[in-house]
Amino acid sequence: MIDLAPLVRRLAGTPLADWANGLQAQLDTKMAKGHGDLQRWQSALDALPDLQPERIDLIDSFTLEAECNGETRTVLRKALLGLSPWRKGPFNVFGVHIDTEWRSDWKWSRVSPHLDLKGKRVLDVGCGNGYYQWRMLGAGADSVIGVDPNWLFFCQFQAMQRYLPDLPAWHLPFALEDLPANLEGFDTVFSMGVLYHRKSPIDHLLALKDCLVKGGELVMETLVVPGDVHQVLVPEDRYAQMRNVWFLPSVPALELWMRRAGFTDVRCVDVSHTTVDEQRSTEWMRFQSLSDYLDPTDHSKTVEGLPAPMRAVIVGRKP
C-alpha cells in the first residue's frame, strides 16, 4: 500500500488540504482495480536491494551514490530492467545508468533557466515516471505532485522513491480529469507533452488554470508547427506514427489560445527541433523510436510527410 499520510501532512494548512485528505481513499480504490502487469512490476520493485544514498544530486542530473558492490549492482540492474521500457530520464542509480529513450535532461536544461521554483507547490500533469518531478525538487520546489494514469510510470516512480522516501514528491496514478474542479492550490503547473493528445486543447488550458493559485504560472510544452497565428495542423490520421495527435499549433497560435484561456504575460521561452540523439531506442527502451517515425530520406518530415517534431515551451500567468 502507498501511504499518503506524508502528503496530507505536507499540504495541511494549504488550499489543497481538503483534497489531500481524500486522496488515500481515491488511490486505494484505483489500486484495487489494478492492472494486468502490476504484479510483475511489483515483483521487480520487491527485488530492489536495500541501499542508502550517501550522495544525492537532483540539481545537475538524477544521481544517487553509495557504496555498492558488483553483486548488489547486478541485482539492482536486473530489477530496474524488469520495469522496462524506460521512456524519460536518464537516471544514475548507484552506478546503474538507466539510458532512457528520451534525454529528458536536455529538455530540462532548456526549460529550467526560465523558471523560479523555489518554495513553490508544483503540479506536473502527465508526469510520466516522475523524472522531472525530481529535477523540480532539485530546482528548489517545496513539493511536487505528479499525475499520470500509466501504471508502469507509477511503478518506475516508486522505484526511485524507494531510495528517496523523505523527499516531498508524490506520483498519483490519476488523469487530470480525476482532480476536482477549481483546486486553485498550486503555484506552478506543468503540462509537457500532453496538449497534442487532447481533443479539446482550450478545455485543457482552462483545466490547468483551475489548478493554479492567483498569480500562479503555467509551463506549457507541446509540439508546434511553423507559421503565423492562423496556422494549426490537424493530422488526417497519424502523426509520427502516433494515432492520438489532434492539434499542433504554431507558436503564435498557441500564445493566442493561452491568452483566450485567460493567461497573461504569455511568452515563448524555447523552440527546438527534436533530434534522433534526444529520442532514440536503447537497451532500456527496445521499441521503435524517433528515427523510425521520420522520413528516412528527409528528416525534416515525418513518415507521413508532415513537419518533423518541433517543441515549444510557453509560459503564462493566471491573473
From Swiss-Prot:
Catalytic activity: carboxy-S-adenosyl-L-methionine + 5-hydroxyuridine(34) in tRNA = 5-carboxymethoxyuridine(34) in tRNA + S-adenosyl-L-homocysteine + H(+)
InterPro entries: CmoB, Mo5U34_MeTrfas-like, SAM-dependent_MTases_sf
Keywords on record: Transferase, tRNA processing
EC numbers, comma separated: 2.5.1.-
Record-level GO BP terms: tRNA wobble uridine modification
Chain sites annotated for binding carboxy-S-adenosyl-L-methionine: K88, W102, K107, G126, L176, E177, M192, Y196, R311
Lipoprotein listed as a keyword: no
Keyword presence, DNA-binding: no
GO molecular function: methyltransferase activity; transferase activity, transferring alkyl or aryl (other than methyl) groups
UniProt similarity note: Belongs to the class I-like SAM-binding methyltransferase superfamily. CmoB family.
Annotated function: Catalyzes carboxymethyl transfer from carboxy-S-adenosyl-L-methionine (Cx-SAM) to 5-hydroxyuridine (ho5U) to form 5-carboxymethoxyuridine (cmo5U) at position 34 in tRNAs.
Subunit and partners: Homotetramer.
Name of the protein: tRNA U34 carboxymethyltransferase
Organism, scientific name: Pseudomonas syringae pv. syringae (strain B728a)
